[in-house]
Amino acid sequence: MKYGVLFMVSCGVMFLILSHVEEVEAMKKFGCNTTHPFPGKCGNNGKSSWVSDMKKLPSAPKNRDIRCECSDRPSLARGMPGERVCRCDYDC
């Protein structure tokens, strides 16, 4: 009985260690990020438009994998259009 419990605990510890290594490697892949506001709303075709808008910026990486998220920001003044804020992660 003691050996069975010891085996189960050691398997659990190894699982935790191995899963942490995978998270560190994933963070290394998309380690850099940038945030930029754009006019308009996010829309339905969000991901493709965000990535293309970000790649048009001179400071954005051109030939790298990029992941973007978009959120709408309401306008602060009446009559002014709202904007969308894109936060993108890319490989350094």
Swiss-Prot record:
Disulfide bonds join C32-C92, C42-C70, C68-C88. This is Putative defensin-like protein 225. It comes from the Eukaryota. GO terms for biological process: defense response to fungus; killing of cells of another organism; signal transduction. Belongs to the DEFL family. Keywords: Antimicrobial, Disulfide bond, Fungicide, Plant defense, Secreted, Signal. It is found in: Secreted. One of its GO terms (cellular component) is extracellular region. It holds the Pfam family SCRL. The keyword Disulfide bond applies. Residues 1-26 form the signal peptide. InterPro entries: SCRL. The keyword Aminoacyl-tRNA synthetase does not apply.
